[in-house]
Amino acid sequence: MGDVLAHESELLGLVKEYLDFAEFEDTLKTFSKECKVKGKPLCKTVGGSLKKDSNSLMIQKDLVAAFDSGDQKLFFDLWEGHIPSSIRDTDSLAQKLEFYLHIHFAIYLLKYSGGRPDRQELDERISYFKTYLETKGASLSQTTEFLPFYALPFVPNPMVHPSFKELFQDSWTPELKLKLEKFLALIFKASNTPKLLTIYKENGSNNKEMLQQLHQQLLEAERRAMAYLKRYNKMQADYHSLIGVTAELVDSLEATVSGKMITPEYLQSVCVRLFSNQMRQSLAHSVDFTRPGTASTMLRASLAPEKLKDVPLLPSLDYEKLKKDLIWGSDRLKAFLLQALRWRLTTSHPGEQRETVLQAYISNDLLDCHSHNQRSVLQLLHSKSEAVRQYMARLVNALASLAEGRLYLAQNTKVLRMLEGRLKEEDKDVITRENVLGALQKFSLRRPLQTAMIRDGLIFWLIDLLKEPDCLSDYTLEYSVALLMNLCLRSAGKNMCAKVAGLMLKVLSDLLGHENHEIQPYVNGALYSILSIPSIREEARAMGMEDILRCFIKEGNAEMIRQIEFIIKQLNSEDLLDGVLESDDDEDEDDEEDHDIMEADLDKDELIQPQLGELSGEKLLTTEYLGIMTNTGKARRKGLASVQWSGDEPLRRPVTPGGHRTGCPVVGDHLISSQNAQQARNGCPRPIPVAQPDDYKEGKRGVAGRATPSSCKSAECAEPVLSSGAQKPK
């Protein structure tokens, strides 16, 4: 009974709302009357939902009419009366729309009074806008998109000011009106569905699926919790041990000052306590700690990372049967096979095991990149099944994460064309688009593919996508900005940007202030690159780009500040710097700087789960698809020291985001181990120390490195890396 009383008002409100919706007028009157007689509270709005108004269409028309006529008071009275405060105050899209609506009414007289606005009314509108900026609109003052408009009330003639040129274009008001109409349609459409009906529809199958997902998430969370608890207990024990040893060492130092000697036995006991468990027994009686330097040398040696153990090769597979089932099998089988093939690559040990897996895929043409048949494995990118499309995109992205995999995929331009088509068409599944975008971004490390993407107009598509960065996932945002930067480093790409210079500069300036700081190196690199074009420099000066950049100098860290200073210097230069423009004539590949990365995102948020008795993963492959001698080894390429970059300068070389977001770094050939890969599914692998990249020069190509989050933030304008110990293969 207590639960009923606690929610009585909302429950009665649900009934009242449905009776009103179904037009049970007499029943509704009787119900309301009886509730009043019994003193039962009636919730006016259910669950904070929108006001239910039978005249919602009329309200929409009145709002649009007030917008068209410039009736500011009527518009905002209707706006505040019929759009719930829960949406106006918390929804970012509603807040942005309201900001632009205030601008619309503030400049309405300037646009539609024939050049002779009523001065008193104009001052009142500007004053109203200023009050809004100082109160409710103050929350958006940290957003780059709106920053210039805070100066609007103080500009004598906004119509001629370059920062506000866009507001007075003929297309600005119709575009804003269209956004308003879409917003109102969405809001009032939601208001017309009674919550009782929604609850009824959602009951049943949706709840069952959600319970299964929650159960799976609970199991994974419990596994992670156990792993973290063990790690925590070990760290706590090590910490207590260190504190104890430290206290003893302090006592020993004090004793030494008093003239007492430290015995070799005591020194040996302290060192053994500090060594790893594996070394304690062997060292206790075999090392002479009386020799000077022995103890410190052994301590440092105990901290060295363990060498990777030799691991066996994975069993050979029957690739003919695999490809046949990938083409003709059921959608569920296709999805499980694609998942298993990806896992075989992502969870294999770096080194010979992973290289053998990759070479087997390539030598058996797993994706039919060289096939001319009408039906091929590649066609799965256009499957009607969402799971198959997504898992195919994940596998392609995994292959593109490795240099040899990129070379395999790049040999046929149809792979690039299919990925570009999937990228532009995929609007249902976010993860599919993320993986397609990730693969294309890694493709952009190779010059011929850069050229093809530029010719295909991908730069324009990326600019359009990045106009609304808040609607994008972190992965999509980072990889799209990094891809845009890589394409902008080519002279052909810069010339493409010059065709839409104003829009390109606006998008990049908005991204400078985005809350995702991982994109800053790519934004800075793109800006620095395109500002080598005189026409883009002129456009940037006209829009006050230097003032915008200096705003960020006040808030940025040291590396960010130095990078922005480089960009400002480029902006104010008159002549092109030597070597800035890179020739497009040479399309030869330089694979010496094409590196490997296997980020944990490849295996995140798995869409399918095996049912009881259903095979998946490596067990599916080795049970149903064992082959004979299909693994073909290949001599491993040995690397040289990587070309490095300086955190003081903007990026000038093609890169890929790699492990910036996940914080799972890669060092040289030591990619994520199988143990770390498994941990990556439950969280994040142990970080491996990374080398800091140092000094990229213009005109070379295909470097990709990777850094830990800390190293990225300490070099925010430095090059994002695909493999931090990036090595040049001979």
UniProtKB/Swiss-Prot annotation:
Its main location: cytoplasm. Keywords: Cell projection, Cilium biogenesis/degradation, Coiled coil, Cytoplasm, Cytoskeleton, Phosphoprotein. Gene3D superfamilies: Leucine-rich Repeat Variant. GO terms for biological process: cilium assembly; positive regulation of smoothened signaling pathway. The modification Phosphoserine is found at S583. GO terms for cellular component: centriole; ciliary basal body; ciliary tip; cilium; cytoplasm. InterPro entries: ARM-like, ARM-type_fold, ARMC9, ARMC9_ARM_dom, ARMC9_CTLH-like_dom, ARMC9_LisH, LisH. Residues 205-242 form a coiled coil. Residues 7-39 form the LisH domain. It is found in: Cytoplasm, Cytoskeleton, Cilium basal body; Cell projection, Cilium; Cytoplasm, Cytoskeleton, Microtubule organizing center, Centrosome, Centriole. It holds the Pfam family CTLH_Armc9. Residues 675-730 are annotated as: Disordered. Interacts with TOGARAM1, CCDC66, CEP104, CSPP1 and CEP290. Interacts with NDUFAF2. Involved in ciliogenesis. It is required for appropriate acetylation and polyglutamylation of ciliary microtubules, and regulation of cilium length. Acts as a positive regulator of hedgehog (Hh)signaling. May participate in the trafficking and/or retention of GLI2 and GLI3 proteins at the ciliary tip. PANTHER family: LISH DOMAIN-CONTAINING PROTEIN ARMC9. This is LisH domain-containing protein ARMC9. The lineage of its organism: Eukaryota, Metazoa, Chordata, Craniata, Vertebrata.
